[in-house]
Amino acid sequence: MTDVSEFHSPAIADQSPASVSVVVIGRNEGLRLAACLRSISCTQGVSLREVIYVDSDSTDGSPDLARSFGAQVIVVHPQRPTAAIGRNAGWRHATAEMILFLDGDTILHPDFLRAALREMLSDRTVAAVWGHRRETHPEASIYNRVLDLDWVYAPGVVEFCGGDVLMRRAVLGKTSGFDETLIAGEEPELCRRIRALGYKILHIDQPMTGHDLQMMSFRQYWRRATRAGHAYAEVSQRFQNSEDPFWAADRRRNLIRGGFWILSAAAAAISIPWLGLLPLLLWTILLVALSARSAWKARWKGSGASVLFLYGMHSHLQQVPILFGQLQYEWNARQGRSRQLIEYK
């Protein structure tokens, strides 16, 4: 069921071919949504045809807040809410040739759209353009600080994008948009189908959005990584028998690495009665050495030595909850059950 309320912004410009519809999705984002909508109005050098906010049954008054900013509002009432449902409702209602997708907890950089459109208009084979997303409050927690580096990708043609991205509406039409059955990984899955049509996904060296992760606890960290594991398993299974078995290698690597850390830690703990603390010491030394190696390889992402080391440790230990997420998907698939949305905020 979908309710649509249209409020046309006075800032909406002409109907030029390069005009853009902005689709923002959210659920109970509150002040973060206000900051997002305010940032859109600061966009430089681009014609914005409309701003559409798609709300997934918020209880905090987000739809009214969006209307106060002049956005068109679509409220969806899915039994099993997913980001894909909101994004599809938004782009199908939009009228511009280009669609900018934003999450409601992000802040748009004023120059991103101009840079992204330049790439789109210069190469018709580019179907999606995205830039750098960074955390707005890395100082708020060690999780924010470390996971901020997860957003850093090298510029160039890539396999997939994230949720903040500029896409061609025509290509969305050819692919039927996002898969609404996925609780996570819907952007990479769509990008795999887009690339199969001969289009390119481009990551540009340009600030795109600031993001408010709001991760303050280990429980949140665990659930986020578990959701990633679920996405790896479900998306890779869809393409496992194709010419391009997307994420198949990542899925196997996650299983091996996650299994290694679990089994090695268990073996070290079990052997304590016979060997004392030596096995645990060796396990810790191995983790530190591999974390330092990963930190050195990721030094191009910037940040200080301590954050890079923690990021290196994260790159290894996150494999454990990722493995659990993959196993949860496998179990549910065997039982014929669909997993509900895994939220960490």
Task: Please place each PLM-identified region on the residue numbering.
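Short, acidic, metal-binding catalytic loop of nucleotide-sugar glycosyltransferases
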Residues: 38-48
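A conserved acidic beta->alpha catalytic loop
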Residues: 39, 55-63, 106
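Glycine-rich, basic loop-to-helix element that forms the pyrophosphate-binding segment
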Residues: 77-94, 115, 159, 163
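Short aromatic/hydrophobic "clamp" motif used to bind/position activated sugar donors
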Residues: 99
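Conserved donor NDP-sugar-binding/catalytic core segment of glycosyltransferases
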Residues: 107-142, 212
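A recurrent flexible, glycine/aromatic-enriched loop bordering the glycosyltransferase active site
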Residues: 134-136, 150-173, 183, 189, ...
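Catalytic donor/gating beta->alpha subdomain of glycosyltransferases that bind UDP-sugars
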Residues: 181-182, 188-246
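Membrane-embedded multi-pass helical conduit in multi-pass membrane proteins
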Residues: 258-331
